[in-house]
Design a protein with these regions (language model features):
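Short glycine/serine/threonine-rich phosphate/pyrophosphate-binding segments
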Residues: 11-15, 38-41, 121-129
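N-terminal phosphate/diphosphate-binding loop that engages ATP/GTP or pyrophosphate donors
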Residues: 18-83
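Conserved beta-strand/loop subsegment of P-loop NTPase cores
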Residues: 140-146
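Generic enzyme active-site microenvironment
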Residues: 31-33, 118, 145
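Phosphate-binding/switch loop-helix module in NTP-utilizing enzymes
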Residues: 78-138
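Electropositive phosphate-/nucleotide-binding environments in soluble metabolic enzymes
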Residues: 8, 16, 34, 93-97
Length: 146
């Protein structure tokens, strides 16, 4: 499930609500924050900030584990933050593509076997990378929050 919208329209709060409700219903849920601010899952894990996939790629190349990318949150909801490029360099959309590829490469979906993956995607940027979860078959439904 992809949730997208313009900034400050309540997308992350909606994603949080979906995660908690689906988790309470017994589903194994993973939320992937796809915003360079990397704050989508903060309310779920309560740690302030977590390492983003792109920070791990930049600082440790490929020398990190799946556990470094996935943080357990409220009720076992799995929290991931894609992160963004170095400010002023790179493309945030390309960063999302890299993060999703890295999760797949490290076996996130096979190991954790989520029933539902919620992608909290920034929707006010004209960039093909932000549509990656839908375009590449990572998600089968998308919702625009207005």
């Amino acid at each position: 499930m992809v949730l997208g919208t313009t900034s400050d329209a309540g997308k992350s709060i909606t994603a949080l609500a979906f995660c908690r409700i689906l988790n309470d219903m017994g589903y194994r849920v993973m939320q992937i924050g796809c915003d360079p601010k990397a704050d989508s899952t903060a309310s779920l894990h309560g740690k302030g900030s977590i390492d983003t996939v792109l920070e791990l790629v930049r600082t440790r190349k490929n020398d990190f584990t799946l556990e470094d990318m996935v943080t357990p949150g409220f009720g076992g909801v799995l929290c991931v933050e894609a992160g963004g490029p170095t400010p002023g360099l790179g493309c945030a959309g390309r960063g999302i593509i890299t993060a999703l590829e890295k999760l797949e490469e490290k076996g996130a979906y096979e190991v954790h076997r989520p029933d539902v993956v919620i992608y909290d995607v920034l929707g006010d940027v004209v960039c093909g990378g932000f549509s990656m979860p839908m375009r590449s078959g990572y998600a089968d439904r998308g919702f625009i929050i207005t």
